[in-house]
């Protein structure tokens, strides 16, 4: 995820105005990487609301379009700096904000392409920075707290670590069932397709597949030491 988002930022910064197709490809690659780890929302991802800054969804009050359009229609010429951008609501940050800017049909009618690309660039910079922070904390400190249980660990026993991982597995499966699948299906006589995750970019089914694949891999790894599970 950290590598893919860094590449996404570099290409967006250099080619947003000239090659939107390439930006979209790298965006989708990075989004895949996020969904494959989306069930690990504890630890470094939970700290400082990092996961929500990457993936604010569902957006039940349509806050993302409101926030982004406010910047797009602004009369000012200044582009937001990263520090300024990180002060706004998480609803205006991350992959779903970027999806709106890249795929929403109304955005193509906005006249100021330079302003749009400026916003996309700062979004990818924020995404890349956040993903790197999560990766660095996992690899330099948090992984040790999971692998080595001692007085300095946040877990009191190996059993507690396993419980945290099972909780992550259960929460991920429930989110996919209730939110990714159940929410857009609605009632039998009234489906709500625009409630589907990432519907603008036609990624909804892909997210379900990737999330279930990641959950399956975690379940298999957790059950390897249990002779009662095959």
Regions found by a protein language model. Give the residues of each.
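Mature extracytoplasmic or organellar-lumen-exposed domains after removal of signal/transit peptides
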Residues: 1-230
């Amino acid at each position: 995820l950290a590598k893919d988002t860094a590449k996404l930022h570099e290409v967006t910064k250099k080619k947003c105005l000239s090659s939107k197709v390439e930006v979209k490809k790298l965006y989708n690659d990075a989004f895949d990487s996020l969904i494959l780890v989306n069930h690990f929302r504890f630890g470094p991802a939970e700290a400082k609301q990092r996961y929500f800054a990457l993936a604010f969804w569902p957006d039940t009050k349509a806050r993302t379009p409101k926030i982004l359009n406010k910047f797009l229609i602004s009369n000012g010429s200044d582009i937001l700096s990263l520090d300024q951008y990180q002060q706004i609501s998480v609803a205006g940050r991350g992959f779903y904000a970027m999806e709106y800017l890249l795929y929403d049909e109304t955005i193509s009618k906005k006249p100021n392409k330079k302003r749009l690309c400026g916003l996309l660039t700062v979004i990818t910079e924020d995404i890349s920075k956040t993903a790197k922070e999560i990766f660095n904390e996992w690899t330099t400190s948090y992984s040790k707290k999971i692998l080595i249980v001692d007085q300095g660990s946040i877990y009191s026993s190996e059993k507690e670590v396993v419980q945290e991982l099972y909780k992550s597995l259960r929460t991920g499966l429930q989110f996919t069932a209730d939110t990714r699948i159940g929410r857009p299906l609605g009632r039998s006589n009234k489906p709500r397709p625009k409630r589907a995750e990432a519907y603008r970019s036609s990624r909804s089914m892909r997210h379900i597949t990737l999330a279930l694949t990641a959950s399956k891999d975690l379940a298999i790894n957790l059950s390897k030491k249990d002779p009662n599970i095959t």
